[in-house]
Every structure is written in C-alpha cells, then in structure tokens.
Amino acid sequence: MLKTINEVFLARDLVRCKSVTPKDDGAINIVAKNLKKLGFKCQFMEFKEKGTPQIRNLYAKIGKASPNFCFAGHTDVVPVGDLKSWTVNPFGGVIKNQKLIGRGVSDMKGSIACFIAAVSEFLKKNKKLNGSISLLITGDEETIAVNGTKKVIEKLIQKKEKINFCIVGEPTNENKLGEMIKIGRRGSITGHLTIIGIQGHVAYPHSSNNPSTIIVEVLNKIKKLKLDKGNKDFEPSNLEITKINIDNTADNVIPAEAKASFNVRFNNLHTSISIKKKLNKIFSSTSKKFKANYKIRYHVSGESFLTKPNKTVYMIKNVIKKSTRINPVLSTTGGTSDARFIKKISPCVEFGLIAKTIHQVDEMARVADLKKLKNIYRDILFNYFK
C-alpha cells in the first residue's frame, strides 16, 4: 500500500541540505527518492555553460497520458548572512514554537515538500491517474539561473514534452497564506552605460570633454522618461539607477570615462527590444550634443508575461479561498522568477508560502501553513483531474 509523505518532515530534511547556489548537498536526491517511492520516473539533467558551475536538475513524471499537471520549484537557497544573528542553526531543520526555521524553508523547500506530500495523498485515493503529474526541480534559481529551469525547458521542448499547466511554488503571500496568486511578471533589463570623454586638467576645461557632466544629463533624462501608465494587469514600468562610477583618484583631473548601471522592470506594453530602442535614442542624442561617444551593454533577465485567467486559474483561486477563507488577488507584482522560462512551454501561475521572512535571518514557515498548503495543492489536483 502506498504510504503518504509528511510535508513537515520532508521540508525539514530538505532544509538540512546546505544547498546554497550552486551547491546541491543532496537536496535533489532527497526529492527524487521520495518521488520514486510514489512511482515517479526521475530524469536527472545536468547543465554547465562556459564559466559557470555545473547544475543538477530533475524532471520527474508519473503517468503517460494527457493532461500533464506540473509543479516547478528550486532547492537552491541564498547564503545565511550573519550566522551569529540566527537563533538556531540555519541548516538544522529546527521546529520551534510550531515553526520550522531554516534557510530556504519558505523560498522554497517548504512548497516542494507540500506538493510531494499532496501528490502522495492524491495518488493514495486515485490509483488510476487520468493524466500525468510532473515536477521540475532545479538547483539554479537564486543567482544567474542559466543552467536550471531555462535549460530544462529547452530540453523538454526539444523532446516535444507536453505540459498543460504548471504551478510554481514561489512564496507569493506577503503576510497570510492565501493572499495572492501570481499570474504574470514584469520583464527585467539591466544596462551598463559608459560615457567616453576627453581627460584633462580641471583648469583647462576647453581642452577636455567631461563625461561626468554628460552622464548626469543622460541619467536625468532616462529617469524622467515616462514609459507608460500601466494597465489593468500590470503596474507602470519603472527605471531605477543602481550604480554611478567615475574612477578618478585626483581632484584636479577631468576623467576620461564615467559609468552607470540601471535596471528597468517593464510590463507587457513593451519588449526588451522596444525598451532598448527608447534608451539608445537618448544615449545617442545626448552624446551627439556633447560630441562624446558612449558604450552600452544590456542584460535581459526575462520578458514580461501574463497568464490570462482561465478555468484552471479560477479553480485554483476557489480552492485557495475555500481553504484559507481569503479571496486571493491575481497579481503581477514582484521580481522575476523561473515562471519566465516555463511560460514558453505551458501556462503557469505561482502560489506558495509566505514571503515575509525569505532571505532573512531566521527564515521560517509555520507548521500549520505547511499543512494548509499541502491540502491546497492536494485539492487542486483533485479538481484538476476530476
């Protein structure tokens, strides 16, 4: 007889893995071991781009028929920070005052444990699965995210694997379980700008071309740029200047270069290409005005995306509302997540634990919330496959 899995004990086992990106420390194996007990076929995928660490990923699946309901998550975690500030061992899996405390418990080992426990309860009552259940688990989400979900999705598309719907276990709730479902995310583009002037003595500015003056004007212009007013699904796009660097050690020298970095979070009224065009126009015109040159380097973390609310989204919303007595908001706020890669193969939403303590000292999840999330995931499966 199939034994069910306890979400708290599994979450505790995962927390005990010191899986700070890019280290795995056995976390993926623990996930696979528990899934194999439930009858899942586990496929490990390892990827390594030049200059990056090798990352182990897992795609596990039970059933061969359609539809395929997928859960996506990551076992890697951020560093613990100041160890002395923690009240417990961050990798001890300590349960104290009905809270499981440890790095990554909310972001997002707890969600992974809850979904696996939910599947175990679902399969115990549904021996004949009318479809497939899969899990996509990566160890590369918290940092550069190049050898994780992105590569797995590319491989699955290449193999013509079909995923009909995916739920990502990100901690979407700010204070209480049930507050928010993410149905999309803004895109993200980072720019590194260099203004090239002419170095000289401050007493002879006519013989120089001060890049500091130019970059100040450029940054003022891009900061004042009104990209849009937002729409019913997204808040307005936003640009923030993150770095200004003038590498000059002398007070009486006009520098040769001035550098700055910025980030744009943009909604679905734009693409990264259209954002680049708007910014490049400002860089070009301002540099021309001052008879200077510029260099710009961009990094696109992801495009904006939106999962239009459909029958499955509303079903998930109703399951959460019934369990928590909170009517969850369908939101597109926040930073980027691996959902930006998953959208290429499947519609997806994000729902998990509470984000209040993630990346902080004494990150924690309430035992009651772990049980409640497990029940939510289980009921989503019952409703999806009925």
Where is each model-derived feature located?
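N-terminal helical capping/dimerization or prosegment-like subdomains
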Residues: M1-G81, E257-S261, I275-K278, V367, ...
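Metal-dependent amide/peptide-bond hydrolase catalytic core
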Residues: L2, N29, T172-K176, I183, ...
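A structural signal for isolated positions on well-ordered beta-strands in alpha/beta enzyme cores
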Residues: Q43, C70, S134-L136, K295
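Active-site metal-coordination/substrate-binding segment of hydrolases
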Residues: N68-S134, Q158-K159, R366, K372
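Acidic/histidine-rich catalytic neighborhood of metal-dependent amide-processing enzymes
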Residues: M108-G184
